[in-house]
């Protein structure tokens, strides 16, 4: 996979606007069309957890609610991964939509997030570290079951959150296949086929193993909205917009907007080339 750093995106746009004005209109026309059915996938972790945790994994509950308010007030539907995937499969007009995802399975996803999902008529996908179920600060069987019954997704974040690109491939079966098995067994044969790579780290070998063990879709830490074409052709590399706890409201809005442009460049202009 080729990675294109953000500075090259800026250079590309500058060249497009300044040196090739004739190409600008088709570009922006295509971008406008892309936006109609592109969906940013938002990545969260803890909501309202310990202030000692880094901003990458925690956001204050009141900040999270302001983000939901912004999305609701601006006409966004807030979906789970399954709802987005089904919408793309069935040719649904997605309109303005985002997907909400939560990694790790923290208890505050139940105590703080779940009530707000119900308040704003939203759904989400919860990527669970299987070995953490029922441990201190993590959701247990009853909490996860209630989330599922409310229409949210149960998904895998592996057994132990080991970084898959850093471990011996002989352990892939344990981290990937066993996670599916135990989640399915504990939650009434729930169909687990969504994966979040720990720390967003993956490579071609990890993708092949995940598909071998029955995962149909996986989310990464690479920015950019996704459309039907991307999800169909790159189901194991669905990018997400990482939402950090120290973001201001304007930064959240800007990052959401920027994800459409990054997704368009990735999906339409650069094809299968990646950047971050």
What are the roles of these predicted feature ranges?
Residues 132-133, 141-144, 148-169:
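Histidine/lysine/aspartate-rich catalytic loop segments that bind and position anionic ligands
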Residues 123-132:
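Juxtamembrane helix-loop-helix connectors linking adjacent transmembrane helices
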Residues 114-121, 139-155, 229-231:
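Acidic (Asp/Glu)-rich catalytic clusters
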Residues 9-16:
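Sec-dependent N-terminal signal peptides
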Residues 127, 157, 218-220:
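Short beta-strand and adjacent tight-turn residues that come in two discontinuous sequence segments
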Residues 106-107, 160:
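Short, glycine/acidic-enriched loop or turn micro-motifs at the edges of active sites
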Residues 2-6, 21-101, 107-108, 166-276:
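C-terminal active-site subregion of NodB/CE4 polysaccharide deacetylases
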């Amino acid at each position: 996979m080729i990675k294109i750093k953000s500075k090259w995106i800026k250079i590309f746009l500058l060249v497009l606007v300044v040196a090739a004005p004739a190409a600008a209109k088709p570009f922006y026309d295509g971008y406008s069309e892309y936006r109609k059915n592109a969906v940013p996938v938002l990545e969260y972790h803890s909501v309202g957890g310990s202030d000692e945790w880094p901003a990458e994994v925690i956001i204050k509950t009141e900040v999270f609610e302001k983000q939901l308010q912004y999305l609701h007030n601006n006409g966004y539907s807030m979906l789970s991964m399954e709802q987005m995937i089904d919408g793309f499969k069935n040719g649904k007009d997605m309109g303005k939509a985002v997907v909400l995802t939560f990694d790790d399975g923290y208890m505050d996803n139940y105590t703080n997030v779940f009530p707000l999902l119900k308040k704003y008529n939203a759904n989400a996908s919860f990527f669970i570290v299987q070995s953490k179920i029922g441990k201190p600060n993590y959701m247990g069987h009853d909490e996860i079951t209630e989330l599922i019954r409310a229409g949210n997704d149960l998904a895998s974040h592996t057994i132990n959150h080991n970084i898959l690109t850093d471990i011996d491939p002989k352990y892939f079966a344990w981290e990937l296949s066993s996670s599916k098995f135990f989640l399915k067994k504990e939650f009434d044969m729930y169909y687990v086929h969504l994966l979040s790579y720990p720390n967003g780290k993956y490579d071609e070998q990890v993708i092949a193993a995940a598909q071998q063990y029955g995962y149909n879709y996986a989310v990464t830490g690479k920015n950019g909205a996704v459309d039907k074409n991307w999800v169909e052709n790159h189901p194991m590399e669905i990018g997400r917009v990482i939402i950090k706890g120290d973001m201001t409201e304007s930064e959240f809005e800007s990052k959401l907007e920027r994800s459409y442009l990054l997704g368009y460049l990735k999906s339409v202009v650069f094809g299968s080339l990646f950047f971050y």
